[in-house]
Amino acid sequence: MAHNYERSVFYQLNLENAAGEFARYDLSLPEPLSESAPLMTRISDNMFRARVQQLKGLAYREYENEAFRLMRDGLTASALAKRQQPHLSVYSDQIVWGRSPVRIDLAGGWTDTPPYCLNEGGNVVNIAIELNGQPPLQVYVKPCREYKIILRSIDLGAMEVVTTYGEVRDFMQVGSPFSIPKAALVLAGFQPGFSTESYVSLEEQLKAFGSGMEITLLSAIPAGSGLGTSSILASTVLGAISDFCGLNWDKNEICNRTLILEQLLTTGGGWQDQYGGVLR
């Protein structure tokens, strides 16, 4: 069945049980699937191979990582297909102020985690909450006279000045306090391949844009609190940048791009966190 998957129901089986049988009887893995195979089939195939190898006590991370890479690439392809054209939409003395609550997950947690939710769907019940009557996640975006991007974090006491596309693209740097705004800037079109226009440098793009940019973050609740902090902060950053850059993303688009942003950061996780804070 595995060798003849195109005409069989192999990848519709319980692949956890199938992997157990392959390991139990020491069966050889089927031939790798071609790149023309459906994306979800290729993801399932790699997770199946990873589980078989794991049960046999063999190296399996390569297959597992490939499965998540395929899922990440499949999601980010939608962002590349819809390139952005950011333009300054505020006056020099104006500030865009984004604020969001966090959320409490009442039921259904982890049913929103891929690839499970892609096959089975997910159902999660959330409620949005504030901290002492105020939204605990806040983002400020304002023009900067110099053609650079200044990133600040009030709660972390950190600052970084970004002057090149390479520095924007460096959002996967371990321990960086500005991974989220950098990835958000990429999705907003401040990176070759994500913009409808082509520029030699970030400075040239900012000159065409009309100003530099200063982004300030404030999170009164730490990441890892279980309240969807990172995801909702990402949505707040994306929403503020959208208003500042005239991208006109609605709430559903912002939440969808948050999913893509988290895939860019390779943090993964569930897909409903941001909805609990944005759709209220």
Model-derived features with residue positions:
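Short, conserved phosphate/pyrophosphate- and ester-handling motifs at nucleotide-, phospho-/glycolipid
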Residues: 230
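ATP-binding N-lobe of GHMP and related small-molecule kinases
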Residues: 4-227, 239-251, 256, 280
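Alpha/beta catalytic cores of group-transfer enzymes, especially the acyltransferase/condensing modules
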Residues: 249-280
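Active-site signature of alpha/beta-hydrolase-fold catalytic machinery across serine-
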Residues: 236
